Amino acid sequence: MEIWKPNVTVAAVVEQDGRFLVVEEETDDGLRFNQPAGHLEKGEALVAAAAREALEETAHHFWPEFLVGIYQWPKPGSDITYLRFAFGGRVDGCEPERKLDDGIVRAVWLSLDELRATRERHRSPLILQCVEDYIAGRRFSLDLLRHYDA
């Protein structure tokens, strides 16, 4: 019997001056907006994964400060389910000459109104949900998470 496993992902929710850091990326469905996000790598702590993905996709140094939420999303039309850990925090420093991950067209700062107006171009409904949860004040201590080295 095969054991089903979700795709574990991390995302960075970053607000600065009323705007949110997102990426525009190439997907099978065309250009889409997403938070800086990606898959957890073997042996990696969730918090470290969020910082790494943000740097790779935006060239910004992201410092996770709290957990916004954990989101389970079965992708329509597939047998894939994502388990997303969304982290809030701050960016401190940028490497403008850094090459962004393959498929990332650009990093951009969008207002909440702009995010809502472009929802049909979001990679998933999790993008807006994470931002709205952040705005609603959802903050969970990183102490909630425990990472054990092998």
Model-derived features with residue positions:
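Conserved Nudix-box catalytic region and its N-terminal flanking loop in Nudix hydrolases
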Residues: 16-56
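Short connector loops at helix/strand junctions that flank enzyme active sites
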Residues: 7, 15, 35, 62, ...
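Conserved N-terminal beta-strand and adjoining loop/helix that marks the start
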Residues: 1-21
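Unchanged
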Residues: 40-63, 73-126, 148-149
